[in-house]
Amino acid sequence: PDSEDQRLINGLERRGADGDFQVKEMDTVLNRRPSIERLYGSVRQYADGKKGIVYAISISHARNIAGYYNQYGLNTVAIDSKTPANERKRLVENFRQGKIQVLVNVDIFSEGFDCPDVEFIQLARPTLSLPKYLQQVGRGLRKTEGKESCMIIDNVGLYRLFGLPTAHRDWLAMFEGRLSGKGYPSTNTRPVAYMAVSQGTDKDKTAETDGQLETIVSHGQLLDYLQSGKSL
């Protein structure tokens, strides 16, 4: 809660036509080298060597993240609305085949993208939209042979607004506007939390690891929750 990036996010005042944070203001505040360095540090600390997707604010932000990650040894590409369709298809296929380690995108993979062996999701784009949050983390929850977990690296504090993806929510109250789409974050969570999604059938587990909150739930349980809104 006291991280530099979280203080910057807490100061965002402008809203877009959809009621979410204004992209221009987010980009001005967070598309800077110190913030990108912290994004890189989180990947190296928690997901080093893993295959993942990063959600960026803007085309410039995505390209700057990819450039920095490549500079420091992570094979990374950025994909956005300006990427030609054939090139996008080629890059995604290379990612699926393991030729690319990290894909940075701008609202391309929020929905309709399937790459089951994604090992981590990094949230680098603040949002006030619960559906967008759940769509983003959902990209890493596909089950595949040999996949033990998917890590959620939340650098922008979305868990503080919405809770972990597994949090119980009063959907009726949200639809009625009484909760404004807010979740129920745990008081024990940290600014950069991560969640491993097990494919096993063990009951939910939580543990503190290196000062970070780790939540492990069965793969089927979490997918069922995201699809139906049922409590885990």
Question: How should these model regions be labeled?
Answer:
Residues 53, 61-111:
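Conserved helicase ATPase core of P-loop NTP-dependent helicases/translocases
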Residues 72-75, 116-120, 146-151:
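Short glycine-/polar-rich loops that comprise or flank the Walker A/P-loop
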Residues 68, 91-94, 117, 132-139, ...:
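Alpha-helical scaffold elements adjacent to nucleotide-binding pockets in ATP/GTP-utilizing enzyme cores
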Residues 103-121, 137-142:
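SF2 helicase motor core recognition
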Residues 126-135, 139-170:
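Conserved segment of the helicase C-terminal RecA-like domain
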Residues 25-27, 31, 35-38, 44, ...:
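Long, largely alpha-helical accessory region at the distal end of helicase-like NTP-driven motors
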Residues 1-58, 170, 176-177:
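Conserved interdomain linker/interface between the two RecA-like ATPase lobes of SF2 helicase motors
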Residues 3-8, 59-60, 83-85, 109-111, ...:
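Conserved nucleotide-binding/hydrolysis micro-motifs of P-loop NTPases
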